[in-house]
Amino acid sequence: MSLSKDDHDRIARAIQAAEARTSGEIVCVLAQTSSHVTGLPVFIAAVVALALPWLLTAFTAMTVYRMLLLQVIVFVTLLVVLCLPPVRVALMPRRARRAIAYRFAMEQFASRGLASNKNQSGILIFVSLTERYARIIAGDDIAARVPQAKWQEAVDALIAHTRNGFVADGFIAAIELCGSELAKHFPPSDINRNELPDRIYVI
């Protein structure tokens, strides 16, 4: 699921409008997937490939050469299929999927400059499509004043729109709600510097 140039522009304008009312920063990230782990697919493909000769020996008179060739083909084919993001994620328990997505969101929080901006007064609006995961992560200064539960309305709006295929609308709704919450606790300062780019990162 991708965003058009118009979607990017709309989201950028929403961030600018929200940040005009607060000294806080808003960063948005849309990830196609948070899981890049291949250990489980490799393990499953290897087990099936290793078990294959035993089955072939029991039920066929295949030569060793053909057996080895088929073993390699099965391993490679299974590995390719199991490494497809939807398949790979489907193999994981829900708790593991959420933990991986959360860890990736925290990495994005740090890499997009939110962990180092002034007073950590910024939030990350994060969605991982394959894992069906959405979360808002706040910097230390914001988290000290605004409980995580306060962001749930924005997360719910984000999920509702995204589930119906309107990803950009979901981000815009979340940005507006987050901007209102930030404005209550972090009004604009005399020098309201825009430290971070007003954009959505699609990765």
Segments from the language model and where they lie:
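Residue-level signature of catalytic and energy-coupling elements of molecular machines
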Residues: S23, I125, A174
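Membrane-cytosol interface motif
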Residues: R94-R112
